[in-house]
Amino acid sequence: MPDNLYATNMSLDLSITGHSTALPQRKSRSTYRFKAANSYVDESLFGSSGVRVDQTLQWNTAPPSQTPLLWSPGEIKENKKTSSCRPKSTPAGTPRKKIQYRVKSRTPSYCDESLFGGKVEECTWDAPWVKKEDTVKIRPLLWSPSPRLVQQSSMQNAKQGPLRAVHPPETSDSPLGTHKGLGAFWKPPESDSDYSPSPFSARQRQSTPGRETVRSASCSGRVTARRGSVKMQERPPWK
């Protein structure tokens, strides 16, 4: 009996010590497991791979049953003039410039706005937080100039002759009315006897005697300057 027990204990020890210990499994990041399955592809769809084409075989192209709806531009015959006008091709190795603008299609586009529903009407009511005092009533400030009638005779005279200064109409009360018949009114008087002052100028002289002397001196200076300029503009006889 003890021999049998010892034998059984030895067999148990061998059986226990003979098994390898299981290592702890590491936790993978993903909890999903991928299962690979064999796939099948019908290679006859891509043509017969075993049959080789004989290169010596001559192919006979049959005439087309109908004319294809294709368009190709005609051959362009280049002339010497056209070839010289074209810019020369850039040499090899030069970097190409990048296109700054994208190519846009030139075909007109159409959009049916009825697909997006009806148009939104503009709100005519005021916001609740806006006061009546703050609202501004906008009124159109329209203005049109008064019509001006231009006579045709005045337009023709303006085109033909030079521009002239416009003077107010002369009356009998004005100082110019007394000297209307005299031709040398704008010329300075040669002596004191030729000068006949008007009542209007006499009143001014009584009121402001100092201004009249300054004005007469300035007028005489202008006349002498004009006369001097006329003498300088005269051409010598040998020209």
Swiss-Prot record:
InterPro entries: RITA1 (IPR031418)
Gene Ontology cellular-component annotations: cytoplasm; nucleus
Motif residue range(s): Nuclear localization signal: 93-109
Major localisation: cytoplasm
Record field: compositional bias (Polar residues): 149-159, 203-221
Protein location: Cytoplasm; Nucleus
A Pfam short name: RITA
Keywords carried by this UniProt record: Cytoplasm, Neurogenesis, Notch signaling pathway, Nucleus
Key word Cytoplasm present: yes
Motif (Nuclear export signal): 12-24
Any one GO molecular-function label of the UniProt entry: tubulin binding
Residue ranges of the region described as Interaction with RBPJ/RBPSUH: 129-158
GO terms of biological process kind: negative regulation of Notch signaling pathway; negative regulation of transcription by RNA polymerase II; neurogenesis; Notch signaling pathway; nuclear export
Superkingdom of origin organism: Eukaryota
Spans annotated as Disordered: 62-97, 149-239
Region (Interaction with tubulin): 158-239
Oligomer status and interactors: Interacts with rbpj/rbpsuh.
Its job: Tubulin-binding protein that acts as a negative regulator of Notch signaling pathway. Shuttles between the cytoplasm and the nucleus and mediates the nuclear export of rbpj/rbpsuh, thereby preventing the interaction between rbpj/rbpsuh and NICD product of Notch proteins (Notch intracellular domain), leading to down-regulate Notch-mediated transcription. May play a role in neurogenesis.
Family: Belongs to the RITA family.
Protein name from the UniProt record: RBPJ-interacting and tubulin-associated protein 1
Species per Swiss-Prot/TrEMBL record: Xenopus laevis
This protein's encoding gene: rita1
